[in-house]
Amino acid sequence: MTPEGEAIIRYTLRNDSGAEVQLTNYGAAIVSVKMPDREGRMADVALGYKHPEGYFFDGAASGKSVGRCANRIAFGQMTVEGKEYRLEVNNGVNHLHGGTKNFANRIWESRVETNRVVMSLVSEDGDQGYPGELCVEAVFDFDDDNALEITYLARTDKTTVVNLTNHVYFNLAGEGSGSVLDHE
């Protein structure tokens, strides 16, 4: 459960090689990616938290989908079609990743379709200061060649700013195995 009492759902996608990806509807997040190395040993290569509570106060947005606008907007100000908008300043003097209540810190609606999970949310006109209602989908596909693909789809009713991404971090030697500088 989130601090607001919303249910967190975990999904697991497995393929024929035994690899698996775990996702959660909190932040449309990748929480685990278990893959075989070149000797066939399985390791979780996605950096994340063992318990959902770790994601509630994670400034790095580990594994989560961020937006409305990934990255910074200088001084929390932007102009769209000649109109100036003021956004929350949440990173020094700048607006970062859509504000403190950005998409990474929300429950997404979710459904399973074959070997994919589709997560969606609606950001109302004026949400976090942005113009236009924005309907977003994040589609997570995982195939038998161990390819994980995230497709973001966005639809709006006004000209607006949208820049979605995922903040998953990897250690190809496996989580907890030390520095990433020795990857081969």
Predicted regions, residues:
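An exposed, glycine/acidic-rich loop-and-rim segment of catalytic or binding clefts
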Residues: 1-184
